[in-house]
Amino acid sequence: MDKILKLINKIKEFEDIDEFIDAKAIKTSSIVTAFWVRFKCKYACGNYNTTLDCPPYSPGPEEMSELLKCYDDAILIKCSNHEAPSKIAINLEKIAIGMEFYKAISFGAGSCKHCVKCNLKSCINRSITRPSMEACGIDVVQTAKNNGYNMVDKKDKTLYFFGLVLLK
């Protein structure tokens, strides 16, 4: 657990992270996957089938559930805009690998915005993009709640965005 806390503290060294609010070590058993999340992507999001990090190209909830079985620990990242969780998660993933978490993999928030139009064949920005939690069937709202976070601030109605780094 000390290594995970050291990793979380590395976030403070990142540049341009004004949107970062908090991060905490969590157990992967608290991460919820559900079929309805993917269904919502398909029918309620205009980015469906437009990038390789969105459905139907991203892993589904069944595949994500299997992936989660390979991990015990994770870091959940809370931010105030949709771009920050992805950026922070990818940077943490790279640092984690150097800290002997060789299975580290990250997930961001929202759809990829690195290309004007995705070629839908082979990602040209794979080193700086990952699928979002929701694109992979993670119920972000319930996962956040399970770990003491709310998706929306009840007082001022601020919407929060989350990223995730799986560690092993």
Report each predicted region and the residues it spans.
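TRNA-binding/sensing appendages of the translation machinery
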Residues: D2-K24
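Catalytic cores of enzyme domains
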Residues: L5, D22-T51, P55-K168
